[in-house]
Every structure is written in structure tokens, then in C-alpha cells.
Amino acid sequence: MLLEQRLEFIDSLPTLPTITQRSLLALPEFSEKPEHDINKPTASVMPDTIDAFLPGVSQAIIDDVNLCKLVMQNAATKKYPEDAQLFEWYRYYVDGLSRLGWVTQNRNLQEITIKKVGLTMDQVALEMAAGLIGANAAQILAGVAKKAVEAVQKDPGAIKIFDTHKKLGTQAKFDVAPVWLDNGGQANMILNCISLDARESTRGILFWKSTKQSTTIKSGAVRTYLDTNIFSGLRASLYKRYSESGKKFIDDLPDF
């Protein structure tokens, strides 16, 4: 795809929702936080999404990853808003990220059953990652993902952002995505889209824990990386259009 076509795609994407003054007051104040130490793991929270960053990921890359995902999740949700449209939502989301420079293979969601009591959302994400990068590597990523989920659970402002689209008693869609750098310095990510029946939890998917012997989920997960050569030509346009409005939907958590 030509650079001009990618830029036209960015221009065609919908704007982020407008937050009312009342809602804005309920969101966390983006006060001064300690500067991110590149040698430590950290995390960010967005609606339905927790991005868990391993040591070595700079703040600039964190910002790039978060904004790409926020913009495309918003576009996919506006195009396919119904729970029953999850398959279409996922395909549009993955295809859109590829237009922003993420190199991945489009893969349909699949239904799988995990036979385990007491499952939490980060453990479900681990199951997805293990099939892509192997159990040992997935365990390393899982440690950071678990800390990320726990950090969000303890932060009322982060919970509010994560629960932006929460509807209790229904299917819940979420993404717990580990992010790390490859030897070329490019961001790699397990791109998740996981949907399951969250009626067991009265507080939503963030605090969900399975009580059944098995849990059936719809899941799509692919390993992907951000091609810096492509994204460098798109960054300015993406940030110009979405950086300011995106701040209301992204909260960078303190390092672990």
C-alpha cells in the first residue's frame, strides 16, 4: 500500500467520542507521574484494553502502540457496534492496524474451551499467547500482564477508563496485550480480542473469575509488529488528528 493511501485511510477514520464535562470530571486527572524508566515494566489502560509493556520499551513507543490501538478500536466499534458483530469487528480492527504499519496476518476469531476453574482475564490472555510464542515465552509475558491487571484493579480512575463500554450481564470483549521489542527495536505485540460470558461477575470483566469447570471463549490472537519504516511516515498525521482527544481515553500507569 502506498503512503498516500495510508494517509487517506487515517483521514477517513472517525473522530474519538466527545466526553461530557460531567464525565470528564470523573476521569483521572493526568497529574504529574514519575517519568517512565525504560528498564522497568509498565502498563497503560484504555477502554476494554490493558497494554503491558516489558522492560526496554520507551515512552515514545508506548504512545505509538496505545494511539494506534485506540484509534482503530474506536473505528471498529463505530462500524460494528453490536456484540453479535464480533467477527466483523475483529477483522476490521486487524485490517486497519495493518494500514497503520502493523505487520500481521488477519485471522478469524475462533471458539475454544478452557477447562479450568478460577480463570481470570490475564490467564485467558496467557492461554492465547502460548499458542503463538510457546509456553515458556508466554509465561514471561504473563508475569507482566498479571501485574498490569492488578495495577488497574487498584486504581479507580483506570477502572473507569477500562469500563467505558461496560454492560453488565452480557458478553464482554477485552484485550490484555503484552508488548516487547525485537532485536531490531520494533514493537512486538500479542494482539488479542477475547469475548466471553461475564455474567458471573457483578463488577464486570476486570474482576471476573470463572466458577465453572470450563469456559468457552471467542478469541482471536496474532503476533504482530509495528514496522517503523512505514509508521514513521504516518506518525505526524495520526498524532495531529488524535493525540489531544486520545489523552482522555489513555492512562499510563506507574512502572511496576
Where are these predicted regions, by residue range?
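Membrane-inserting effector segments that mediate pore formation, membrane fusion
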Residues: 110-163
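Short, charged cytosolic
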Residues: 84-98
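Alpha-helical rod/repeat scaffolding segments in eukaryotic adaptors/tethers
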Residues: 79-86, 110
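Generic N-terminal initiation segments characterized by hydrophobic and/or small/turn-forming residues
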Residues: 4, 51, 64-67, 94, ...
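Membrane-proximal, non-transmembrane alpha-helical segments
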Residues: 99-111
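C-terminal assembly and membrane-engagement modules of membrane-active proteins
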Residues: 1-78, 87-91, 151, 155-256
